[in-house]
């Protein structure tokens, strides 16, 4: 009798079934991981801008959106980042703060994100009354970056 060489059809079918089960579990988990990292990237794009706003307010200056140089005659500091600096979305500043009497909002709208975050917004708001920053997001609860709330 000849010795068997290779795999039988049933063995190959079992391997294919195992790979299918692993893929069914791994792909959704990877998509969730990508969605969480998009939120973290958006927050990381906006968070450092708080320093620019605080510095301008401490000097009694205003902050304008976009890039450029300080204008001492207008007492104006650029935000220091282009609106489209992150490929995941856009950054906006409202209102342009001058004397700290109005609440300041930095928003990141995720226009270039994946399907789970498309159009979602991360907002950093500085209240004029106490000068504290608060991060909120309209993302699904599981994708909101640490330090933000719904």
From Swiss-Prot:
Swiss-Prot/TrEMBL keywords: Disulfide bond, Fimbrium, Membrane, Methylation, Transmembrane, Transmembrane helix
Q: According to its UniProt record, where is this protein located?
A: Fimbrium; Membrane
Its membrane topology is listed as: Single-pass membrane protein
Q: Which GO terms describe its biological process?
A: cell adhesion; type IV pilus-dependent motility
| Cystine crosslinks | 135-148
Q: Which residues cross the membrane?
A: 7-27
Q: Which residues form the propeptide?
A: 1-6
Which domain of life does the protein's organism represent? Bacteria
Can you quote a single GO CC term?
type IV pilus
Predominant localisation class = other
Question: Which parts of the sequence carry N-methylphenylalanine?
Answer: 7
**SUPFAM superfamilies annotated for this entry?**
Pili subunits
A Pfam match is: Pilin
Q: How does it assemble?
A: The pili are polar flexible filaments of about 5.4 nanometers diameter and 2.5 micrometers average length; they consist of only a single polypeptide chain arranged in a helical configuration of five subunits per turn in the assembled pilus.
What does the sequence similarity comment in the record state about its family? Belongs to the N-Me-Phe pilin family.
**What protein am I looking at?**
Fimbrial protein
Its gene is pilA
């Amino acid at each position: 009798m000849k010795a068997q060489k290779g795999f039988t059809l049933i063995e190959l079918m079992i391997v294919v079934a195992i790979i299918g089960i692993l893929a069914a579990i791994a792909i959704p988990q990877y998509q969730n991981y990508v969605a969480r990292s998009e939120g973290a990237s958006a927050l990381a794009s906006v968070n450092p801008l708080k320093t620019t706003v605080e510095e301008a307010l401490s000097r009694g200056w205003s902050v304008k959106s976009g890039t450029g140089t300080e204008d001492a005659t207008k007492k104006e500091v650029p935000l220091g980042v282009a609106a489209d600096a992150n490929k995941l979305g856009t950054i906006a500043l409202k209102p342009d703060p001058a004397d700290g009497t109005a609440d300041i909002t930095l928003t990141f709208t995720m226009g270039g994100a994946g399907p789970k975050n498309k159009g979602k917004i991360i907002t950093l708001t500085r209240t004029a009354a106490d000068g504290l920053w608060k991060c909120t997001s309209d993302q699904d609860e599981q994708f909101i970056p640490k330090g933000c709330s719904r």
